[in-house]
């Protein structure tokens, strides 16, 4: 059985945080849900590199916006993929350091899950090739033997 992928989900709105957590957990993800960006940074800074598979956060939050959270998170763990979901979308917001940006309300839960799947897979990297795919001469040698 494959280990569950871990998503750090950050939103100051408890109801939205609860819905996202439920959505992700029912699809097999392990979710660490936090309600403010400072707790998120604390979680990121105390986690070992590679233990978090995705940062999923809101754009507009008190104390620190999503772009700033993503910027600081990537200073700590540069390989951590990040996705921002927000109802407030401007050209500047989309120019942030997040790997994906989805407009809240304009995307379905299925679309959110697909983006999550893609970002987690991208972090993992390409699947390892089988021995025969890495060395085709082994395959032809086995076929002629």
Identify the residue ranges that each predicted region occupies.
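Charged docking surfaces used in two-component/phosphorelay signaling
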Residues: 18-26
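Acidic, metal-coordinating helix/loop segments flanking the phosphotransfer/catalytic sites
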Residues: 33-54
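Active-site residues of response regulator receiver
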Residues: 58
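Receiver (REC) domain active-site loop signature in two-component systems and cognate sites
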Residues: 61
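Hydrophobic/aromatic residues positioned on beta-strands within the core alpha/beta folds
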Residues: 85-86, 104
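C-terminal output helix
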Residues: 105-120, 124, 128
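CheY-like receiver
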Residues: 121-145
């Amino acid at each position: 059985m494959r280990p569950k992928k871990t998503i750090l989900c950050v939103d100051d709105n408890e109801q939205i945080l609860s819905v996202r957590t439920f959505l992700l957990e029912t699809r097999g993800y392990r979710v660490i849900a936090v309600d403010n960006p400072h707790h998120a940074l604390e979680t990121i800074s105390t986690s070992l590199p590679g233990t978090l598979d995705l940062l999923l956060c809101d754009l507009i939050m008190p104390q620190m916006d999503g772009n700033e959270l993503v910027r600081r998170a990537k200073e700590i763990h540069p390989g951590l993929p990040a996705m921002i979901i927000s109802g407030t979308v401007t050209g500047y917001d989309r120019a942030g350091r997040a790997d994906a940006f989805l407009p809240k309300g304009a995307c379905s839960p299925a679309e959110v899950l697909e983006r999550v799947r893609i970002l987690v897979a991208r972090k993992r990297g390409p699947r390892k090739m089988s021995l025969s795919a890495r060395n085709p001469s082994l395959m032809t040698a086995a076929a002629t033997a």
